[in-house]
Swiss-Prot record:
Gene (UniProt): NP24-I
Induction: By salt stress or by viroids (at protein level).
InterPro entries membership: Osmotin/thaumatin-like_sf, Thaumatin, Thaumatin_CS
Protein name: Osmotin-like protein NP24-I
Organism of origin: Solanum lycopersicum
Molecular-function GO term, any one: beta-glucanase activity
């Protein structure tokens, strides 16, 4: 009976392991606290400078996104607010964040057994970011970056506390939101694209902004402020925040 029990446990563990398509490591190199968020899996985690959060993403995960929240204040129950990236006033996100927020987006094991992933500024920008496979395999499976000083150079019409908002949220309409058919870049989307050519700058910016890696065998790393305190392109002021409760 003991042998059968051990065999069952081993089989169960192997099945659980097999269901994970990718491990995604989220690291905060910013000189301030970032409250990382991840949906539809993960929820949220407070990351002080230098801390890492590991997310195990199942096969078939899609429409997934990771972002950083700044200027947060949560109570012991995990309720509060964030200056940027807030997701309904909770630490454990179940929905998307409020713009502006720099996004790492991914879908695992999709068409032709490929992972599809990107950095998106369609919701605006709040924190510099790198998104990378841990073992690049050539082609479009390589690190991508958005580390420009977008907050410092943000057009006045898009500038908000803690970030640089997106034109759709700010102005609305088909020209910026692309909700009613094909659309092209605008002068405001070109502002983002010039500074972060790897990233989506408007909703239909697919050709230069979507990256792929082999599904089921690739792990990833998302880094906030990848250049840390030595980053000459990013202002080092601390985002507004009050007392926080770590979870």
């Amino acid at each position: 009976m003991g042998y059968l029990t051990s065999s069952f446990v081993l089989f169960f563990l192997l099945c659980v392991t097999y269901t994970y398509a990718a491990t995604i490591e989220v690291r905060n190199n910013c000189p301030y606290t970032v409250w990382a968020a991840s949906t539809p899996i993960g929820g949220g985690r407070r990351l002080n400078r230098g801390q890492t959060w590991v997310i195990n993403a199942p096969r078939g995960t899609k429409m997934a996104r990771i972002w950083g929240r700044t200027g947060c204040n949560f109570n012991a129950a995990g309720r509060g607010t964030c200056q940027t990236g807030d997701c309904g006033g909770v630490l454990q996100c179940t929905g998307w964040g409020k713009p502006p927020n720099t996004l790492a987006e991914y879908a695992l094991d999709q068409f032709s057994n490929l992972d599809f992933w990107d950095i998106s500024l369609v919701d605006g920008f709040n924190i510099p970011m790198t998104f990378a496979p841990t073992k690049p395999s050539g082609g479009k499976c390589h690190a991508i970056h958005c580390t420009a000083n977008i907050n410092g150079e943000c057009p006045r019409a898009l500038k908000v506390p803690g970030g640089c908002n997106n034109p759709c949220t700010t102005f609305g309409g088909q020209q910026y939101c692309c909700t009613q058919g094909p659309c092209g870049p605008t002068e405001l989307s070109k502002f983002f694209k010039k500074r972060c050519p790897d990233a989506y700058s408007y909703p239909q910016d697919d050709p230069t902004s979507t990256f792929t890696c082999p599904g089921g065998s690739t792990n990833y790393r998302v880094v906030f402020c990848p250049n840390g305190v030595a980053d000459p392109n990013f202002p080092l002021e601390m985002p507004a925040s009050t007392d926080e409760v770590a979870k």
